[in-house]
Every structure is written in structure tokens, then in C-alpha cells.
UniProtKB/Swiss-Prot annotation:
This is Chorismate synthase. It catalyses: 5-O-(1-carboxyvinyl)-3-phosphoshikimate = chorismate + phosphate. Pfam families: Chorismate_synt. Homotetramer. NADP(+) binds at R39, R45. Reduced FMN (FMNH(2)). The gene is aroC. It comes from Staphylococcus aureus. GO terms for molecular function: chorismate synthase activity; FMN binding. It is an enzyme of class 4 (lyase).
């Protein structure tokens, strides 16, 4: 299973092609659009999300509500393109026209791809870099993840997310499954403890007033995974490695951990390893879940707990020092329309990126041409955990 996205932030559309989805999977576009809507929400978002109304159009790979087993193409229209039609159009324009529209960027933003991308691809107008490196591309990745969540639901696998920390204000590290799911999306910062939600909003408002931005930590939980997905045999087949690669590929994400993560370094092994238990109903299970559902690069049947660290967004309304690439003179960095905090939205993006990593691993573990075949193999693996 793989996918390819295309499109620029202010171009006409984002396009994604997904290959490897089994045939006969029931897909309702409204289920995908429900997930797309979640990405647009969250306290601290900028004006762009007031313009866009992200919805997906499926243009191939699905017929009469069911997947065909062929590549699935989805399109997300950029409504904001109407304001950028000439500057982002395909037809050539003169340097004078470009200058008059004041859209040329020569002052790279610290922490963004602007300068290095310009060097690498020889772009003197850094807009050519930021249009593709923008987090707008994550809308396409959420569409992919939403499709994967439809698949996972058919396998009785649940995946959900929350915000753990914003700007140093922290929620509890872990919640039991029932509390977690009962409190999803109860507030606009996506935190479980409603008592700290306002403190987070205040922190975001403070950053916005100061022309600054703040980051945070998000958490994704995957429940009811069959055991043994992934592998200890080769580095590139380890499930935690694959999830980690996906998470740190999200714009502005700078760290990932599983279960107790970096806190494991502070504790003895006797407090971190999860004891193996058995009963005839569950089969093998663990007495705790410090390791976040992963051992030896494989799922162990416990909830997979993924923590992702998002740095503050690099576009600042109180810009940092930079250098004009044409004159080499000191300037303040370019200001682009941006969010003061995108952590709540990033939790949704992270959830869908993890959903793809899980779905991809399952389809490699249980190679299946159609959904019925996949379901049967999952049932057999779950039974193995009891009978082994």
C-alpha cells in the first residue's frame, strides 16, 4: 500500500493517489469528509481555515460505494485559489507583474524550508518552495488516513487522538480507554481534561498577541491490533520504526516516542518491561503497557501509544532576523498568513498518518486482494494469540 500526493498550497487542488487498498471495501465519501472537517478545527487556527471547506471528491478506484482494488484517486479543491489564480497559474507572467502583486519571496523564514529548498532546486522566488512545503499538503494525507480508518474499522481496530500538551501546559500522560473515548473532541483544544482547556486557550491567545507561536505534544492510540504485525528480522520492517518515520515526516514534528517514551530512561527495567500474562479468553496479554504496545518491532496486542512533538510554527507575525537572498542584506523574515498554534489540528493529522502506517503494515503482513480475505486472516492471527 502506498500513496502519492501533488499540489501546492495556493494552487487549484490537492490530488492523492492511493494504491493497494483491497477490493470490496465499502467507502462513503461523507466518512472521509468528516475526518477532513476535524483537521480544519482547533483553537489557534488562522484565517485560511475560514476560507477553505475541505471536501474530497473520489474520481477513481471506487464504484457504487465499494473499492475495486485499483488505484483510488481523491481530489481536494483549494477554494483560496480564486485569490491566487494569476500568481499560481500555469501561464508565464512578467517579473514586473510578479513584483506588482507583491508575491515574490526573497526573505526566508527561519525554521522553514524556504532557504534550503531555494538552494537545492535553484529557486530565486522562494514561493516555489513554501507552496509545496506548506502544511496544506497534510489535507491530502488526512484523506488517505481517513480511507485507512475505514479499512481499520472493518477489522475492529480503533484509532483516536488527543492533545497532551500546549505551550508547557500539560494533561495527564495516560487515560484508560473508556475515559479517552468518552471525552474525544469535547473542547476546541482536543484535551481530555476540560479543566485545563481554558489555560491552553489563554496561552495561545498570548502567543498570538505577541506575534509568536507555540507547539506541543499529541498522542495517538491504536486499539485491538492483532499480535505480531511488523518484524524483528529487518530494521525496515519494524512497526515502531515505520510509525516513527511517518510521524516525524509531518510538518513541524520534531520528535516521537512510544508508551512512556523518554521517561523510560529514568526508570529501572523492572518498572518498564510489561509482564506477560495469560487467560483462556484473551490469550497472552500484558499486565501493564509501559512500552506502548510494541516489542521487538512488532505489535503485542496491547494498545499502541504514539506521542508526537510539534515545534512552534516557524511563520511569525513578529518575524525573526533573516537575509534577503538577492541583496544579502539583513531583513526581517517574510510574513505569510499562518496559525499561532496548530497543535489540535496536528493531532488529527498525526492520527491519520499513524492510520496509514498501521494499514500498510497490516496489508503487508496479511496480503489480501479483497476485504473478506483480509478479515479472515486477522481472525486467524487473533486466534493464534490464544492457542499458541
Amino acid at each position: 500500500m502506498r500513496y502519492l500526493t501533488s499540489g501546492e498550497s495556493h494552487g487549484p487542488q490537492l490530488t492523492v493517489i492511493v494504491e493497494g487498498v483491497p477490493a470490496n471495501l465499502e467507502v462513503k465519501v461523507e466518512d472521509i469528509n468528516k475526518e477532513m472537517f476535524k483537521r480544519q478545527g482547533g483553537y489557534g487556527r488562522g484565517r485560511r481555515m475560514q476560507i477553505e471547506k475541505d471536501t474530497v471528491e473520489i474520481v477513481s478506484g471506487v464504484r457504487n460505494g465499494y473499492t475495486l482494488g485499483s488505484p483510488i484517486t481523491m481530489v481536494v479543491t483549494n477554494d483560496d485559489f480564486t485569490h491566487w489564480r494569476k500568481i499560481m497559474g500555469r501561464a508565464p507572467i512578467s517579473d514586473e507583474e510578479r513584483e506588482n502583486m507583491k508575491r515574490t519571496i526573497t526573505k526566508p523564514r527561519p525554521g522553514h524550508a524556504d532557504l534550503l529548498g531555494g538552494m537545492k532546486y535553484n529557486h530565486r522566488d522562494l514561493r516555489n518552495v513554501l507552496e509545496r512545503s506548506s502544511a496544506r499538503e497534510t489535507a491530502a494525507r488526512v484523506a488517505v488516513g481517513a480511507l485507512c480508518k475505514v479499512l481499520l474499522e472493518q477489522l475492529d481496530i480503533e484509532i483516536y487522538s488527543r492533545v497532551v500538551e500546549i505551550g508547557g501546559i500539560k494533561d495527564k500522560d495516560f487515560y484508560d480507554s473508556e475515559t479517552f473515548k468518552a471525552n474525544l473532541d469535547r473542547n476546541d483544544v482536543r484535551v481530555i481534561d476540560d479543566g485545563i482547556a481554558q489555560a491552553m486557550r489563554d496561552k495561545i491567545d498570548e502567543a498570538k498577541t505577541d506575534g509568536d507561536s507555540i507547539g506541543g505534544v499529541v498522542q495517538v492510540v491504536v486499539e485491538n491490533m492483532p499480535v505480531g504485525v511488523g518484524s524483528y528480522v529487518h530494521y525496515d520492517r519494524k512497526l515502531d520504526g515505520r510509525i516513527a518515520q511517518g510521524v516525524v515526516s509531518i510538518n513541524a514534528f520534531k520528535g516521537v516516542s512510544f508508551g512512556e517514551g523518554f521517561k523510560a530512561a529514568e526508570k529501572p527495567g523492572s518498572e518498564i518491561q510489561d509482564e506477560i500474562l495469560y487467560n483462556t479468553e484473551l490469550g497472552y496479554y500484558r499486565g501493564s503497557n509501559h512500552l506502548g504496545g510494541l516489542e521487538g518491532g512488532m505489535s503485542n496486542g496491547m494498545p499502541i501509544i504514539v506521542n508526537g512533538v510539534m515545534k512552534p510554527i516557524p511563520t511569525l507575525y513578529k518575524p525573526l532576523n533573516s537575509v534577503d537572498i538577492n541583496t544579502k542584506e539583513d531583513f526581517k523574515a517574510t510574513i505569510e498568513r499562518s496559525d499561532s498554534c496548530a497543535v489540535p489540528a496536528a493531532s488529527i493529522v498525526c492520527e491519520h498518518v499513524v492510520a496509514f502506517a498501521i494499514a500498510k503494515a497490516l496489508l503487508e503482513e496479511f496480503q489480501s486482494n479483497h476485504i473478506e480475505q483480509l478479515k479472515q486472516q486477522i481472525i486467524e492471527r487473533r486466534q493464534l494469540n490464544i492457542e499458541f
